[in-house]
């Protein structure tokens, strides 16, 4: 079943803020093979994924039917240990190609003051029901 086109423009916040800790950074760095030290530039995916999961859950879309097509980040400033971050995903586009839904999203990552730290754009390919 295709994804509802009225989703375009809807926002899905991550369920809770995330505090960037040295332990989280270390675990993420080890998982992705980053040498450690500063917060890896791909770390925002942790929070962006929480917002994406909120979208998938709200719309009853099975993560196992999603292929991650593209991901980009643009930074207003580097992330740092101690940052408390929140994320909101917005569905920015939707089209169907060959029976698949191509879902464009934008995630805004903000700090505790509400300042934008990072924005992410992703393309998700939804294969529909099995």
Tell where the protein language model's regions lie, with residue ranges.
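Hot-dog-fold acyl-thioester-processing enzymes
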Residues: 1-70
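HotDog/MaoC-like acyl-thioester-processing domains
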Residues: 1-3, 78-130
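Mid-chain, well-packed structural core segment of small domains
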Residues: 62-88
